[in-house]
Design a protein with these regions (language model features):
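Intrinsically disordered, low-complexity regulatory regions
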Residues: 1-96
Length: 96
């Protein structure tokens, strides 16, 4: 029998924020970067530069936060998105 999944009472609103992040990422797949069959990020990863690219963008948006258009939530979403791309790249490079 399957156990009923326990409802977690997140202290930092993680459940809602993860849903918001997924919605943000979903919208990027309809944006100008995805008009072609392949995204430029795919080529960068395939050329072996994915980790540097992703982590460089994490740093870029972290340093920009609070400077361009104030304390912009979009910069934080971009940090999280690029961190996920870095995690994907890590997993791809370290498959067993």
């Amino acid at each position: 029998m399957f156990k009923k999944k326990e409802q977690i009472n997140y202290k930092f609103n993680e459940g809602a924020l993860i849903k918001e992040l997924q919605s943000y990422i979903d919208k990027t797949y309809g944006g100008h970067y995805s008009k072609n069959q392949f995204q430029s990020t795919e080529f960068i990863i395939d050329c072996g530069h994915g980790m540097g690219f992703a982590l460089g963008n994490v740093l870029k948006y972290a340093q920009r936060y609070g400077k361009k258009e104030g304390y912009n939530r979009a910069d934080l979403m971009k940090i999280l998105h690029y961190a996920l791309i870095a995690l994907h790249t890590h997993d791809k490079n370290h498959e067993n």
